[in-house]
């Protein structure tokens, strides 16, 4: 794995043969054809072994709670001006951003609202632009969605505890939970720790805000038998290029 840059790939080839590439910025496939083989997963699946097992996908659905329905109705009815000097299309764009955050978690949507309100209040008063009141109304509705009202979270909690899912929280059955939003990650980290009565070191989180050293330590711990970690909650930083499969076969 590498970042796609010619120089990065050249550095890997030079580990195998320091004389293969004279100029990391200027080389051809003929320079390296003797030291690497390119294969895709589809090519390897036909080799006659069972190294690549078929993945099983299940789509889980949950019915929205009353407070979630109320918040979504407020969101749908919301009309954003965005900025006195900007176009309405930008208001629609930000509303799409809010919608994605809302479907991630109330916490993620509230964070997006707070960031927008901070920018607006640096330029306007509440009377200058109606967006401030509109966003405050939506924020108030979202604050009423408690963890108990957060239907997706409650469904996740039920799944992890269910006999059908059969998760025993053993060292060889660890779980990776992905989320795009940092606030959702933080919410899950704190709430799952409480609701599953997990110790602090049994649940970890990882995001792009962390240093490479800290990220690598978490990945290494996740793959060790003796490590107490059972759940890893991660942002997109862990979606590619990390080996998390040694002690885990479940992704959420």
Task: Please place each PLM-identified region on the residue numbering.
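Conserved two-lobed SF2 helicase motor
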Residues: 222-240
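Short, surface-exposed basic-aromatic patches at helix termini and helix-loop junctions that form
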Residues: 14-15, 193-198, 249
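A short beta-strand-to-loop transition that corresponds to the Sensor-1 phosphate-sensing loop
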Residues: 1, 106, 179-182, 234-237, ...
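Conserved Helicase C-terminal RecA-like lobe
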Residues: 52-63, 107-228
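A short beta-strand element within the Helicase C-terminal
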Residues: 8-11, 242-252
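A short acidic (Asp/Glu
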Residues: 6-7, 186-191, 245-246
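Amphipathic alpha-helical transducer elements in NTP-driven molecular machines
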Residues: 3-6, 69, 212, 216, ...
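Inter-lobe coupling linker of SF2 helicases/translocases
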Residues: 1-124
